[in-house]
Amino acid sequence: MIHLPPAALEAHVAILGKTGSGKTYRAKGYVEDLLREGRRVVILDPTDAWWGLRSNAAGDGPGFPITVFGGSHADVPINEHAGEALGELLGREPINAIISLDGMGRGEMHRFAERFLEALYRVNQQPVYLILDEADEFAPQSGERGTERLLGATDRIVRRGRKKGFRVWMISQRPAVLNKNVLTQANTLIAMRLPASQDRKAIEAWIKGQADEAQAGRAAR
């Protein structure tokens, strides 16, 4: 695994790649590095993919000190109405957390997330790495009806959150459907296999904002 330099960790990061490309494996490796260094991490996990961080690699002993809220491996069960209270709690307390939204309907997940992100932004004042797995769920490009408030909450954290301690990592298998105003705020982008031309164009657009047009075209091929 390629190790990120320290400067890259102090920035917003996008990790992009199709299903099976290894993006989640790589992202977990980077998050493990953060936890080893004592950084505070909060993970929004729509698919219950991250709970294993609390176990060791063999699965027979303790791993990292991280609390799982929600999902089938929950330390603390949650429902769609818990978003604001949990956001306030994690904004006040130095707790590492995985928030599994698996088992919620899509509308329930969106309602939970919008209130959680609003409360976390309002209360938090300390450094925290906010990991958005399947980030296009929280910042959709399409402007899907009913997601306006959620997109606004995500966009506000990404654009304005650095002064309040936020470092946001966005993980997505479809950068084409991840909101471009949010994606362009990433300072570091890690792109893995992306066979769809629309997804490669999204990468090219990001690179154009960071480099010259010739470099962007070469990198997106």
Whereabouts are the PLM-identified features?
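Conserved ATPase-coupling elements of RecA-like P-loop NTPase cores
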Residues: L53-R54, G105-R111, N124, D136-G152, ...
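Loop/turn-to-beta-strand initiation segments
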Residues: G38-V42, P94-A97, V123-Y129, K164-W169
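Substrate-engagement module of ASCE P-loop NTPases
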Residues: F116-Q125, L150-W169, A211
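Conserved H-loop
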Residues: P46, D133, F166, Q173-R174
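Switch/coupling segment of Walker-type NTPase motor domains
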Residues: I2-A8, Y30-R115
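Hydrophobic positions on the alpha1 helix immediately C-terminal to the Walker A/P-loop
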Residues: R26
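Conserved ATP-driven motor cores of ASCE-family P-loop NTPases powering translocation/secretion/packaging/pilus
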Residues: T19-S21, V31-E32, R54-G59, E80, ...
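The Walker A (P-loop) glycine that initiates the GxxxxGKT/S ATP-binding motif of P-loop NTPases
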Residues: G17, E134
